[in-house]
């Protein structure tokens, strides 16, 4: 499977990533589609501390979809946001992780202790390349009382005992931080596909995976 990365800028500040620009994105995706088997976009976008995608994210999602992008993995809001599959009028489907939240954090509010690890199965066979299934594993930042130490646990490995020892409880309005709080918020954000018994969002798609239509130019979203 071929992978092609666009990151470095060709100007006087090559250490700064590209801003979201429609013309630049269109050119990059068009080139990437010629060079790679699949196109994955990782945008820095969205409104901080909000659990749902904003109008700006929706705009760029529709642009990515119209260009034939296969997967979007978003960051920046510092909290989890939903995961969904969107499709256009010609049948092309695109997987979107709107925000993975914080993998590790020293921020001072309960929701910012929760993040997620994206996982998906990409298949290449005689029919082409496609997403077979996708997953999100929630993670919890553990700040230790009296120590300058921070670590990360999978939510599936987290306990009420660990939660009671999380130094986030010292911060204003956070004394009730608990395992049940984390599970409730993750379920609220990820919806019915999230399985509290395994602490996983794990979605198996139809046998042929996501539909890939590289000629698609029109778009309208629908959630799976």
Identify the role of each PLM range.
Residues 1-224:
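Acidic, metal/ion-coordinating pockets
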């Amino acid at each position: 499977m071929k992978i092609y990365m666009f990151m470095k800028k060709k100007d006087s500040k090559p250490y700064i990533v590209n801003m979201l620009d429609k013309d630049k994105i269109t050119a990059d995706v068009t080139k990437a589609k010629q060079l790679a088997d699949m196109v994955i976009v990782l945008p820095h976008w969205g409104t901080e501390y909000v659990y749902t995608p904003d109008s700006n994210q929706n705009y760029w999602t529709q642009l990515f979809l119209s260009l034939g992008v296969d997967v979007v993995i978003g960051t920046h809001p510092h909290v989890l946001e939903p995961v969904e599959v969107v499709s256009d009028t010609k049948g092309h489907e695109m997987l979107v992780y709107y925000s993975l939240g914080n993998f590790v954090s020293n921020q001072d509010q309960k929701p910012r202790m929760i993040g997620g690890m994206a996982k998906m199965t990409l298949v290449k066979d005689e029919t082409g390349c496609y997403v077979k299934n996708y997953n999100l594993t929630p993670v919890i930042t553990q700040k230790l009382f009296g120590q300058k130490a921070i670590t990360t646990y999978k939510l599936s490995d987290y306990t009420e005992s660990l939660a009671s020892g999380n130094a986030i409880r010292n911060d204003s309005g956070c004394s009730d931080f608990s395992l049940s709080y984390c599970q409730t918020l993750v379920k609220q954000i990820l919806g019915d596909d999230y399985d509290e018994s395994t602490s996983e969002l794990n979605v198996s798609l139809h046998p042929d995976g996501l539909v890939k239509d590289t000629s698609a130019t029109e778009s309208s979203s629908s959630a799976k």
